[in-house]
Amino acid sequence: MPAIAFLVVSFLCGFEITKRMKVNIWGRIAAGIGIGYLISGWIVYIVSYFSKVVLGLTHPKVYGNIASIAIMLLIAFLLIAKDKTKMSLNTTKKESAFFIVLFVFILWTMFYVFHVTTENGKELIKSGVTIFSDFAPHTAMIRSFSLHDNFPTQYPHYGGADVKYHFMFQFLAGNLEYLGLRIDWAFNWISATSLWSFLVLLYFIAKKVTGYAAAGVITVFMFFCRSSFAALDKIVNALADGRWSDFFNNSQFIGYTNHEDWGLWNYNVFLNQRHLGFGLLIAAIAIMYFIDRLEWLDDIEVNGEGRFSRLKSGCMIVGKHIVASKDAWTISTSWKTAAVVGLMLGALSFWNGAVVVATLLILFGFAVWSNHKLDYAVTAVITLILTFIQTNFFMDKSVGQSIGVTYQFGFLADELTMPGVITYLIKLAGIYFIGVVVLMLVLRPSFKAMIFSFILPVIFAFTVSMTPDIAVNHKYIIIATIFLNIFFAYAIVRLWKDWHGILTKCIAVILISLLTVTGAYDLLTIYNSDKNAVGIDLDSKLTGWLKDNIKETDLVLTGEDSMSETTFAGIMLYNGWPYYAWSAGYDTETRAHNAITIYGSDNKEEIENLVKCEGITYIVYTDGMTYEDNPCSDKVIKQLYDCVFEDGSVRIYKTV
């Protein structure tokens, strides 16, 4: 199957590129997967785009895939020929078993919430209730590439314009479906391998920083299990009233803050935002490269008597080293590697832009405490140049709201004040951020610098907005906590292993329980919730007709479609479910007003003018439909345009 060949060659290329990484076989596999996806995805996209838009060729993805496979094979062959040293596994059975079990679990969860099944002779794609809403734009984008040639790329829920959403991960999934993988395998495989690869590298970062493999395992465990007091509340209530059946069968996400009922802070985020795991995989490679540069802080010799005197001496030494020394502002001999890191982060911008922002913030924190700050500047400048190029290529500033940085204090706190933010963080994460402050005070200097760096995305989330919906800033806080977990894991291991005694072991158990119990309960909630799923008939007459008759240049007026047989055809909707396009920066209000007019007006001339002016080529009408609670009718539409498809209550009219 072409898709399997594509994946194998992609991995082989990435794996060979990682030869110089200071990790064992598992680390190389993980990094190789990420680099392979990044390179192969861009080659296919660029060649396919050029083939269709510039050369006007049909079947552009054929040329894109041939070019991608050929280039990746060439890179792999040249690297193998250049360096024939034998590969060392350098791993343990326990470590290998841990990674294998981890992969099986992640892959199972991906399929649990999104899979194809057969019911009553129909092939249905099932999406769990916790993810189907976010999957509406994801699957529509995937299908716009697998069933159509979405070049220049448009946003399917707001067609006829540009694309303001980082779509490249969906493009990769769409390309794999085009090459023969069923959509659930295409999306789930790259999602599972990307997230698994990130967690493998997170394990190695934690192991490298702390010196404990156990800290790596705990860090990965904490990734799945967030901190909050909410589950303790549920446990206390169950103990009080004895309703344990309700406790174990709960299907609603719990918490005390706005939108926690969305599953905004738990593993569900990675089940519905599949590209986030991939973005973090590339970010982890960048962080692994730079994090060693903070170790010098632990070698400072501080003189003086008394705590204050020693603190003053240490601050003066650090300040002189990071500001006044010659090495602080020079470029290192490994600046070329820093440039490659910049290329990777820049290439990531339209795979996951939020991860790029968070990573640059973290690297800025590293740079503050490091020598050779120009290396960081090289990485940042290349990243920003590539991001600027892509943003101007994909996004039309005249359409909707362009990306902008605005000051917005408080995030989702009830009171937009500093006390309100502190209260919000305690309600959201329990003891977590109190623990971060304590760890920053008591841990060694290099750890203090790392914590300072990893906390910067949290500060960004509470002060800056780049989109119309401030809630999307939750990703910055999630990213920060994922890396901050390393230091909690270190503290837990030290309490358990290095300080002998039952008391410290009890403290370790209590600490990890408080930090993970709500996240563990969230996993149960996901399991319970996604027993219920939204099913879409993949072979419906409507999907088939739309797939075969609608082109990517057509613009189709529908109801407020989220995930449906219409969106699974991969067509460009005039105004799909408005939240998706609105949160990406599109003017959904104007289009909604136009749609209400077209479906509800009795004025033929008004409808004709609107349809022509907006470039709408097809109108889909379903008996009994409403638009923003306004009644709709096709009484006038059928007088103006020919009905080209009818199936039950659904009719499609062609306007040109």
Describe the function of each predicted region.
Residues L195, L276, V357-L363, I470-L495:
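Hydrophobic/aromatic-rich transmembrane helices and adjacent perimembrane loops
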Residues K93-E95, F105-I282, N532:
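Active-site lumenal/periplasmic loops and adjacent helix-entry segments of GT-C-fold
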